[in-house]
Structure formats: C-alpha cells, structure tokens
Amino acid sequence: MDAHTKTPTGPSRREVMKAMSLGVAMGTLASGSLVGAAPAAAQSSTGTNAGMGPLATRTLPRSGDTVPAIGLGTFLTFDRLPGAQRDDLREVIRTYWDGGARVIDTSPLYGTAEYCVGAFASSLGITDQVILSNKVWSTGEFAGDESHAIRSLEQSMGRLWRNQIDIMHCHSLTNVDNVVNILRAWKKEGQIRYVGVTHHENLYHDALASWIERDVVDFVQVNYSIFNRHAEERVLPAAAERGVGVLVNMPLEKARLHKVVEGRSLPDFAREFGAETWSQFFLKWVIANPAITCALPSTSNPDHARENIAALTGPLPDAAMRDRMVRHMETIPGFNDIAKMPWYPDKTYEGTIRRAQVNLRARS
C-alpha cells in the first residue's frame, strides 16, 4: 500500500492512550469497534500482550496519558536504498504493535526511515494510533525565520501521512534556542502535542537537564543503558522532579551489549524478574527506573523485535536487583570497554546514510 493512502478513521491517539490508562479493551470501546482496518492480532487488550499478562506502562505526568514502556527506534535500521527489499521492516513494526508497543521514534535525519514507518503503519492500518516521536533541527533563512522548520514538518507529515506529530524534538540540541520556541508555537497551534529535546552523548547531558529545568519541554530523549548510566546524575532526577517524560535512545548500546555477552548464558537470578533473553535482561533494567517513560531499542530483525517487546511483560527488577545486574555485567570481559566498540559490531546497514557517508569520504 502506498504510504500516502489514508487509513480508516478511528479514535484519536489521545483516546487510545486514555483507554490504556483505564484498562479499556483495545479492540472495543463503549461505542463499538475501535479500528476496523487494524490487524486482529493488534486488537489485544491495552495493558496486555496477547494474553501474556499486564504490560509495563508509564503515565505521562503532564497529560495523564499512558504509554507502554518499550517503543521502536529507527536510526540506521529502517534506512533502505530505494527499491531494496524491506518486508522485514514491516514485520518488525507488526511485531512491536502486536506485542503492545505504541511509540515509534524516527527523524528526517534517518534516511528513508520516515518513508518506511509511514508506508508500513498505513498498510497495517495503525497510522492514526501510533504515537510518533520525530525531530527537527533547521530554522530558516535568517534569525526568527522558521521557513526551513516548516518545510521539514510538512515533509515529515507527508511521509508519515499524519496531520499532527505527537512528540516533536529539537534534534541533538541543534539550534535549540530557536527550535524550542518554534516547537512551542506549533504545540499551541495543534500541529504537535509535545515539545522535546534530544541527544545521544554524555557531553550534552547537562544541557538537556538545563532545558528540563526551564519548564519549557514536555519530553527529553537521552542515551541510557546498563552500561552507560551517566543520565542518572542529573537528567533523570530533573525529569522526575519536573514531570518531564523520558525517552531512552541506545538502551542496547547499538548491539554492543549483545556482542559482549555473545555465547554466554543468562545468570540464574534473571529468572527472578522473568528475563529469558539478554534483550529482556538489558531492557528490563532500563525501564525499571521509574524516571523512564519509554525505551526505544532499534532493530531490523523480527526475531529480535519479539525479544525486545517481551521485556514489557513480567516483573521488573527492583533497585537492589538492578545493582546486582550491573555488578554481574562488570564481571564480563569487554563490558567496561563498550564505548570503544563500533556501533552494530559485525553488521553494516546499507542504506542512504551509508551511501552518502561513503561518497563523502571518497571525496574528502
């Protein structure tokens, strides 16, 4: 189905999230069917995963909306060259959706990721129910001009086939003083629902925290994992104090966590919080922090998607167990050197980003 095929009408994303917080069945509301075009498997109960029990959810402090604590990231993994096979990406989105995930994070910076998300959300009939997290970083031709930002917003809406973006971030704090003001105007005008700021490097955590402390953003997206716990120093406490939602990028350290545990069995104590795979082990550690709203692991592999989404079910580790998990990881060779490893070890994503980077390196 074309990415610009309008999905059938249904309840708004706000209604879906409110229904989740009330425990209302996702397949039906008092008035009847929710979304006729949604796959049957996607119409499981909100707050449950196809009969596997309650999902780990978080309530957004500034709205009362509730979201599942695992979503989908798309950097590199959803970037494909035009014409390349991408059925696996559709299956990843379907798997996440059927498993209860509702947040998908993307960006114009991510090559063809927006096209893929828009096309497959449309073909699955979930366009109007997905909670979209997106980004902008441009402003305009001169100080105070927002023409480039508006063009970026309109382009994203066209690719994703939406007339409103749920969470719009200033990407990597680029032009942040101007962009946040633009986002606040868009929120007031109804073009977006929430204002956010993002970064993926520890060096910028103080800057992220300062924006949280100004009380002008609703969300922050930050790197955080069992390996990289730097956000606990200032970003997460500030977000918890100010009622700001926290999206987590790099919760699996771009596959580097899996690399260091390759061939290793889970510790026996992982059974105490229902972890059956390393993905569950790492993701449950992240979302067990009460400051975290939603972790955004990325993958292009449907089997890995199933492992990731399984972290939504079962008990979460308490503070003492989380400390024990860290101590265990610190005994594994290579864990303390993860930052020195390349992203996605042993794997190359052949998309538009890589093609452009290779071409630029050849010319420079």
Question: For each of these PLM feature ranges, what is it?
Answer:
Residues 10-15, 26-47:
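N-terminal twin-arginine translocation
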Residues 26-31, 60, 234-364:
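Structured C-terminal cap/extension of enzyme domains
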Residues 43-71:
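N-terminal amphipathic alpha-helix/helix-capping segment at the start of soluble metabolic enzymes
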Residues 60, 72, 104, 117, ...:
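Conserved, mostly hydrophobic/aromatic
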Residues 139-230, 234, 240-247:
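Glycine/proline-rich, positively charged
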